[in-house]
């Protein structure tokens, strides 16, 4: 089971990762008759910690990656409408002309130690939000996913840079 834990801003939280299963039946046995379905994007999972103007980004391995994404650091205060929050998202490189997603390898050009400013221009991104773990001093992990998703959609202002990963609630009847 999931144990209660104390959330502290700027201390990354180990993400929940998907388990492999052999069949649809096994999925239903593990998670029940109602579940959310989302697209799997080919990007970098990120945990975004925000408190006022202070913003830090962490990878799924809990590594601080803020320096690779100065554009996110710059734009987040205009997108997030909360005093503080911990959000989960997938960063995906895009083709600026078509809006199409680019392969993960293109995004990894951002991970070079030098010429970050050039990489920001050459490899534009979108931040695709899918969960909220903490908001305005409250632990959101105790809420069910649908409630967290509503809260996320209330505080993240969607635009061409910040989007929600499309989600569908499915039922096994």
Model-derived regions, located:
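Catalytic cores of nucleic-acid ligases and guanylyltransferases
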Residues: 1-173
């Amino acid at each position: 089971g999931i144990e209660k834990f104390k959330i502290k801003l700027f201390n990354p939280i180990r993400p929940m990762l998907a388990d492999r299963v052999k069949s649809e039946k096994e999925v239903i046995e593990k998670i029940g008759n109602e579940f959310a379905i989302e697209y799997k994007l080919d990007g970098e999972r990120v945990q975004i910690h925000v408190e006022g103007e202070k913003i830090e980004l962490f990878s799924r391995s809990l590594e601080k990656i803020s320096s690779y994404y100065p554009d996110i650091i710059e734009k987040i205060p205009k997108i997030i409408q909360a005093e503080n929050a911990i959000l989960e998202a997938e960063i995906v490189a895009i083709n600026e002309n078509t809006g199409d997603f680019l392969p993960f390898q293109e995004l990894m050009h951002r991970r070079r130690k030098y010429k970050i400013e050039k990489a920001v221009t050459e490899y534009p991104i979108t931040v695709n939000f899918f969960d909220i773990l903490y908001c305005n001093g409250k632990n959101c992990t105790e809420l069910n996913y649908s409630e967290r998703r509503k809260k996320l959609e209330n505080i993240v202002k969607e635009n061409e840079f910040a989007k929600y990963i499309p989600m569908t609630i499915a039922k096994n009847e």
